[in-house]
């Protein structure tokens, strides 16, 4: 059985990051990444758009999360998983394993 679960998504942080520490002492940073691009499908151009919740966990990743604010442009590498909210609804979340800040050229 093939079990590949990899996602790379670039975009702009569109919601203020929430930083928490779990009861076991693991730091977590949660934010939403908005992606917009033009993709080719069946020989035609189409607009692609999504908002993806992102979770960054662990001490080694927290240094980069301190510079993340609304408007920061990022490329996130990681895996996706389903999380169930308090309301019982499930959503797909990107668990970041690597984050690259995109230089806006300002």
Curated annotation (Swiss-Prot):
Subunit structure: Homodimer. Interacts with PriA and DnaT. Component of the replication restart primosome. Primosome assembly occurs via a 'hand-off' mechanism. PriA binds to replication forks, subsequently PriB then DnaT bind; DnaT then displaces ssDNA to generate the helicase loading substrate.
Disulfide bonds: none
One GO CC term, this protein: primosome complex
Gene (UniProt): priB
Family membership noted in the UniProt record: Belongs to the PriB family.
Keywords associated with the record: DNA replication, DNA-binding, Primosome
Domain SSB: 4-103
Alphabetized InterPro entries for the sequence: NA-bd_OB-fold (IPR012340), Primosome_PriB/ssb (IPR000424), Prisomal_replication_PriB (IPR023646)
Function text: Involved in the restart of stalled replication forks, which reloads the replicative helicase on sites other than the origin of replication; the PriA-PriB pathway is the major replication restart pathway. During primosome assembly it facilitates complex formation between PriA and DnaT on DNA; stabilizes PriA on DNA. Stimulates the DNA unwinding activity of PriA helicase.
Pfam families on file: SSB_1 (PF22657)
Coiled-coil segments on the chain, per record: none
Name of the protein in its database record: Replication restart protein PriB
GO molecular function: single-stranded DNA binding
């Amino acid at each position: 059985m093939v079990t590949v679960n990899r996602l790379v998504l670039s975009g702009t942080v569109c919601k203020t990051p929430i930083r928490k520490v779990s009861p076991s002492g693991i730091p977590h940073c949660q934010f939403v990444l908005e992606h917009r691009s033009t993709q080719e499908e069946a020989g035609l151009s189409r607009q692609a758009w999504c908002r993806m919740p992102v979770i960054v966990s662990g001490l080694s990743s927290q240094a980069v999360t301190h510079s993340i604010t609304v408007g920061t442009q990022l490329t996130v590498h990681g895996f996706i998983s389903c999380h169930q909210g308090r309301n019982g609804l499930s959503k797909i979340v990107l668990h970041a394993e690597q984050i690259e800040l995109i230089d806006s050229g300002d």
